[in-house]
Amino acid sequence: MENTQENPTSQNPKPAEETARQAAEAAAPQQEAAANAATDSPASAEQAALAEAQAKIAELQESFLRAKAETENVRRRAQEDVAKAHKFAIESFAEHLLPVIDSLEAAVAHSSDDPAKVREGVELTLRQLTGALEKGRVVALNPVGEKFDPHRHQAISMVPADQEPNTVVAVLQKGFVIADRVLRPALVTVAAPK
């Protein structure tokens, strides 16, 4: 007769093996989670670093845009200031010329037959004009007796003279400078070499 009873050990594994198998099955998700956590840990650290870098980039971009806008504002204000300076630079000078205009208009309105009075009026007006020019730092050049300077003088002719050669003998037309910059060179005659 055959033994119809099966070996209980073949159907039912030993309780220790079963427990080990169950423990292994239960531990598998935990190990997988731990492995994922181990792999997630560098990934999450990388994501955190990436997020931090992106935040820093956004902050720097905003800072750059603000600085660029401020630079544009400064440049625009500087251009406006220069434009205003050019527009109104002559204002002070023009204010000094207004009395000269008043004097000339008065002379035209009250013309006199007396040449002495007319001359006196013209001389006063010339002094007013010279004063206005000097207030604007415009000064006349009268270089008689000075060495010829091609930067400040324009020689019209050379004449024999008792003076040292290349010395200004006569001024045909005054020159003018404004703050050491030549507006118009003086037209002069120069002593010729002997």
UniProtKB/Swiss-Prot annotation:
Q: Provide the Gene Ontology terms for cellular component.
A: cytosol
Q: Which GO terms fall under biological process for this protein? A: protein folding
Give the domain of life.
Bacteria
Q: Among its keywords, does the record have Iron?
A: no
Q: Which UniProt keywords apply?
A: Chaperone, Cytoplasm, Stress response
Which spans does this entry mark as compositional bias, Polar residues?
1-13
Q: Which GO terms describe its molecular function?
A: adenyl-nucleotide exchange factor activity; protein homodimerization activity; protein-folding chaperone binding; unfolded protein binding
Q: Name one Pfam family in it.
A: GrpE
Low complexity compositional bias, start-end: 21-50
Query: What do we know about how this protein assembles, alone or with others?
Result: Homodimer.
Which protein family is it in? Belongs to the GrpE family.
Q: HAMAP family, alphabetically?
A: GrpE (MF_01151)
Q: What is this protein called?
A: Protein GrpE
Q: Which organism is it from?
A: Paraburkholderia xenovorans (strain LB400)
What's the gene? Answer: grpE
